[in-house]
Amino acid sequence: MSSKPRTRSSKKPTLIIYGATSYTARQLLAYLDTHPDSVSFDFILAGRNQQKLEQANNKLSQSREVVACQLDDPDGVRSLVAKGDIVVNLAGDECAKTGKHYVDLCGESSWLATDIIPRYNNLAIQSKACIVPSCGFDSIPSDLTLYLAHKTLQARHPVLTISASQSFFKMKGGSMSGGTIQSMYSVAELPKDKRRSGEHDCIPKDGILPKTRSTILKLSYIMKIPNKARRYGSFFFMYPYNRTIVRRTQYLTNLFSGSNSGLASDSGSSTPKYGKEMKYEESMDIGRGKIGSSIFSFCLFFVFGLFYASKLIRKLCTYILPKAGEGVSDEQLFKASYAVTNLSTSTPLPDGRTVQISTTFKGQGDPGYLNTCYLLAESALALTLDKDKLPIPASKGGLLTPSIAMGDVLVDRLRKSGKFEISSEILGEDSDKKID
């Protein structure tokens, strides 16, 4: 490991950005460099190539500490992790050992289910480190919309939970990132006994949640919001992964609600309680109606089927699809946006009626490249700068989800960033029902 020190206040909380020379990291560094809270924290650029790290550092408004470190160098990784308060995008094992928080953009349930949760969850609990994967477009919008739907519902009806929930994703521009495509390659190359695609793969079989079958993937989906036109959606390619994070949140709320500490924090905020049984679906609204959505889904199933079944097809795709580290133009990055609409239905009231909650989550910028950097950065800053406001589960540590580890703190940071519009309301009831 080689390090080139810069002027850095040791008193400030410090983020370690590993992989700081990647395409996505370029957007992340620019966001952190000009962040309104930048006087309150420092960050270190880390990666494998000293020269490229220096080049990335030269583009910042002020010089930062640069550390070149190989991941197969345990002493180097240990020394690097010791320099900061939170690691962004690497070294989850060393963080779990030393009690340092960690966030990343993981989108591989197989990796979480077979390698990370079994090996590091208990270790992180012992050290009180928050290990929080999937802090980007995969899967914060999915996790937080359902979290807010529960918060909105239980602010009016504390004993109710959500029995069914669906989210529609609407993209304006945007592209599939090279990192996401690389994750697909990684999963496809795994031995069959290590592949995971079930929505309950990231929760233990300890009886806290009942055994349920995974939701069947469909060609088309329909969303019926009262007094609005019906919306039809197609299969959303990140749904199989996003649902594993949603299910882990569901599991953790039930786990913590049964503990002595509960779910309320000292700051007065609390994590909502999820029910033990809940149907969850996601879809992509392509604006083509039921038939068009069904055809699009069929094409996706066919293409993905070929991709995962044939090494030859995957080899050909390497010449067509973006590679990790590749991206689109800055103009395309900033023009793109997305909107997530979640419609959730409660368990029955005593009179048999149910309550519906509508939650929206809108983000600026290409979801796979630019917006995901905003989400990742604010997640890291929430764990670093707002420790006293975090939910109780964050003080316990472990392999957590964004809503469990950060909850309202993350929602507030996203709103204040100016890059997101987030709201949630109960439908069909009187005032005092909206969270925004």
Please state what every model-predicted region is.
Residues 56-63:
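Short, conserved SAM-binding/catalytic segment
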Residues 67-86, 90-93:
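Conserved Rossmann-fold cofactor-binding substructure of NAD(P)-dependent oxidoreductases
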Residues 46-50, 70-71:
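N-terminal Rossmann-fold cofactor-binding loop
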Residues 106-129:
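Rossmann-fold NAD(P)-binding glycine/threonine-rich loop
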Residues 6, 25, 128, 140, ...:
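C-terminal catalytic/substrate-binding lobe primarily of soluble NAD(P)-dependent oxidoreductases
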Residues 12-35:
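N-terminal Rossmann NAD(P)H-binding glycine-rich loop of SDR-like oxidoreductase domains
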Residues 14, 85-86, 101:
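Structural motif
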Residues 36-44, 412, 418-420:
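A generic structural motif
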